[in-house]
Amino acid sequence: MVKGFIFFRDGEIPFVIEDYRMELFTDDSLLKDFTKEHNFKKNYIIQGQCFGIGSQCQKATFLVEHSIGNTCYLCCYIINRLVEEDEYNTIGLQSPFLDDVFRYRYNYLDMVRAGTNLAVEPKNAYKIPFAMNDRQHDLVFRMGHNNRLGLLEDFDKKGELLIPLQIVEIQECYDISKVFYRLAMFMTSHSEVPFKRITLYKDDRSVGWFYCPLMSNEAASASDVMFYELDVMRFIPKILRNIALDSGNKITKSIPLGHLGNFDSMFSPQRFVEQVMAFEYLFDKLDQKRAQDKRFPLRKELEYMFDEFPQLLLQSKLSSDKVSDQIKEIRRTIAHGHSYYYDFKNDSNTQQLIILLDKLIKNMSLLWIGFSKEEIAEFPIH
């Protein structure tokens, strides 16, 4: 729980934050004026201070998604290290999932074997340019510590993605965090890939922290073996550039990700429907003429794409037309209310079709990004 107060007009309104929901409270008429001015207001910024250790206050900035009455629902917020400290120019993302994607463990072993001491000086493993919201950015994947803070150094840190900011606003920080969260989603084929910590820097010096719902103190990953042979500089730049086309809540230009699930939703009717929607979205991007042809229904679209990637069915006893017909039939039974959650949980054939659809959607995504079929065959799809 975070406590503090926001500035409004010439006064201060106390608050508490829990689960990114800010509750304002006071007997002063100032709260009434605030609610009158901000009731049902969307996407605005408020400033304030948070209570730190003892009597120390820290400057805070809040991006409000919307507010109802005296409750503000937050997209994210920034807490500066000191009350007068408000300048930052770089955001640093720590993610165990992106550590795996950028091959932290394997790069670490290579650097240590080469005689590099990462406890003394950090090293940049990769530098990747990308564009977001019509602005150019540079991503640096850095490993190690700079030792400037002594015992205050973050010794749990492994790798860190550092992105210099262009307009230095909280919205830019939020957009960047969403883009790299989506990168982790696509690479791991999983919907829950939280950041462990997001730090704000001024010339390599930590000056504050960024908080959003995409974070978790319990974030952990063990998927590094998936990316053992990944050629990072061959695949990640193109994928990142595509994902960064959409930094908002709607995906209209980049690859779809809404069909990805977690452990609980992996095999469910709802996710199956979302997979079909993702497939149709990509098919329209790849072959708009056939997608708009009424004589080319879903079953034919599926068969066409499975024939484009025959390696997906090498270990299956079914042909592309049989698989496509089964997928079409399952979607029909869901639409008519004949399929239920427990049907999916206990049907190994349906589960296999869901796994096949995941692989097909990832292949189609890579094809749309601009990779050749030969390159796609070398991409680690699990």
Question: How should these model regions be labeled?
Answer:
Residues 1-183:
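Long, contiguous, compositionally biased segments that the model treats as domain-scale units
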Residues 9, 21, 81, 103-105, ...:
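Arginine residue identity/basic-tract feature
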Residues 19, 43, 72, 180, ...:
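Intrinsically disordered, low-complexity N-terminal regions enriched in serine/proline/glycine
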Residues 47, 54, 65, 76, ...:
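Generic signature of intrinsically disordered, low-complexity segments enriched in small/polar residues
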Residues 164-192, 226-242:
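Ampiphathic alpha-helical segments that act as solvent-exposed interaction surfaces
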Residues 190-217:
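Short, conserved secondary-structure transition motifs
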Residues 207-382:
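Amphipathic, oligomerization/interface secondary-structure segments
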